[in-house]
């Protein structure tokens, strides 16, 4: 049995049936990490001994009948902005290079309760600010589909680890597309749930009103299973929702008959690579052939999403990142003659250029004289974007479009032009602004063999509709 080629759900079944063990699966994937990390650099930290010990404990519980769930014994990777008790959590930043949390994020605890084995922490853009995983203090991650190209970001390490078979599934976070875009670039499935579905407790904040944790997996079945496992109401997160409809695996039905799918014309205009456009429209035809009703429509305000997002996210980041000052934890500059100088040097030396750029931008839009002109205006536009989606979902069950305007760019090509990098998020960020769920599903490759992702967007709390549409497409093209 080729263990590495199994999906997470298939592996858990094989462990339950005694065809392999959690320890064997963990050892196999750790050997794969040792062999492949020099090329791909998906991880910041690999907890080899801890993972094998955890796998042995999980295996005992499986054999005793105490753990019977669909992810018991499955090795997972965790994005390095989620706290993991006793394991380095750096946000891929120098300022947190020695930070070891005393607690774990709620989403990680939910995985561990289900019997998942935690392999380590994946590389990311520093503090989740970036779209290429090139702003990491710990070096770039390479795309397993072509190592000369980026894996996307900011959850690039998680997406690449799944694609490179360096884990069976991973957790990422999505503030403006940071799960869906790397999933598209690496040819895996990635889902951002409705805001408030997965607890943010233990997620080191970037943009608190936009951040959401979600799965990166090999297929849609794994995606639904992981989402079902990590979803819970959490009083420790004031934005956590109480939901009854979290049996997401019940939506794994290949049936879209009568489903109304809208394709926004605005998503297929200038700047979209023709190969991406053709692949996404071909995917829409597959769903149409399965009985879905597909039609084009106008979704206004898309052009305003980027300035709105970078105003709101930067403002929230400048506030959230104030706590990193070298006093209680993290990097502290040496030989500072007074407290103010220590703050200044610690932050100047500890944060990278992209993080500093966004902190300064956020501080500017919140400053006296500019607050009304920029920040309040952005909040008004955010409300209008939500209204535009509400109107669309009065007519359609699902909105279908591309995840990104191009396939994965070459390493180094985006950092030279931050504006170009920001424009790469044009199809994903409005979903975060509106708090909606979205999923990226592989729908082909370009002429270079680089993966293309189709994005399916749903109304609030309609993850099941998205999973049904994504599963139908996946089964139709298998």
Residue ranges with predicted function:
Residues 25-29, 308-309, 355-363:
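Short alpha-helical scaffolding segments that buttress acidic/His motifs in well-ordered protein cores
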Residues 94, 98, 239-244, 307, ...:
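Short, surface-exposed loop/helix-turn segments at secondary-structure junctions
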Residues 1-53, 289-291, 364:
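An N-terminal boundary/leader segment
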Residues 31, 35, 113, 164-271, ...:
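Structural helix-boundary/capping segments
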Residues 71-213, 264-266, 315, 401-419:
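Short glycine/serine-rich loop/turn segments
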């Amino acid at each position: 049995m080729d263990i590495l080629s199994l999906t997470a759900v298939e592996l858990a079944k094989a462990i339950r049936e005694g065809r392999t063990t959690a320890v064997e699966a963990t050892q196999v994937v750790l050997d794969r990490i040792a062999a492949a990390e020099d090329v791909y650099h998906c991880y910041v930290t690999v907890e080899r001994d801890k993972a094998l010990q955890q796998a042995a404990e999980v295996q005992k519980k499986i054999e005793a009948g105490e753990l019977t769930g669909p992810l018991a014994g499955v090795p997972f990777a965790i994005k390095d902005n989620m706290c993991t008790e006793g394991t380095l959590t750096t946000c891929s930043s120098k300022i947190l290079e020695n930070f070891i949390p005393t607690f774990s994020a709620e989403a990680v605890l939910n995985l561990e309760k289900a019997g998942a084995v935690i392999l380590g922490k994946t590389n990311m853009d520093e503090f989740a600010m970036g779209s290429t995983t090139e702003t990491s203090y710990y070096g770039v991650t390479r795309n397993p589909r072509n190592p000369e190209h980026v894996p996307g970001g900011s959850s690039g390490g998680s997406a690449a680890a799944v694609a490179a078979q360096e884990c069976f599934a991973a957790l990422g976070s999505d503030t403006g597309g940071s799960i869906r875009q790397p999933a598209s670039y690496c040819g895996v499935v990635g889902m951002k749930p409705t805001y408030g579905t997965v607890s943010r407790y233990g997620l080191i904040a970037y943009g608190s009103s936009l951040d959401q944790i979600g799965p990166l997996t090999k297929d849609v079945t794994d995606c639904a299973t992981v989402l079902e496992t990590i979803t819970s109401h959490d009083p420790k997160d004031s934005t956590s929702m109480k939901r009854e409809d979290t049996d997401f695996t019940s939506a794994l039905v290949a049936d879209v008959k009568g489903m109304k799918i809208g394709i926004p014309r605005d998503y297929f205009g200038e700047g979209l690579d023709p190969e991406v456009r053709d692949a996404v429209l071909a995917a829409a035809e597959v769903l149409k052939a399965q009985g879905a009703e597909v039609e084009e429509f106008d979704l206004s305000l898309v052009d305003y999403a980027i300035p709105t997002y970078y105003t709101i996210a930067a403002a929230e980041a400048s506030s959230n990142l104030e706590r990193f000052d070298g006093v209680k934890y993290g990097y502290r500059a040496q030989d500072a003659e007074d407290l103010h100088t220590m703050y200044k040097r610690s932050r100047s030396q500890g944060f990278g250029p992209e993080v500093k750029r966004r902190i300064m931008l956020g501080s500017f839009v919140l400053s006296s004289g500019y607050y009304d002109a920029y920040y309040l205006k952005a909040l008004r536009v955010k409300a209008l974007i939500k209204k535009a989606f509400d109107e669309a979902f009065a007519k359609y069950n699902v909105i279908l479009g591309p995840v990104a305007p191009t396939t994965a760019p070459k390493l180094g090509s985006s950092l030279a032009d931050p504006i170009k990098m920001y424009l790469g998020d044009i199809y994903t960020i409005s979903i975060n602004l509106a708090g909606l769920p979205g999923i990226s599903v592989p729908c082909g490759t370009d002429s270079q063999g680089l993966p293309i992702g189709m994005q399916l967007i749903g109304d609030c709390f309609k993850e099941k509709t998205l999973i049904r549409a994504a599963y139908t497409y996946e089964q139709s093209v298998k």
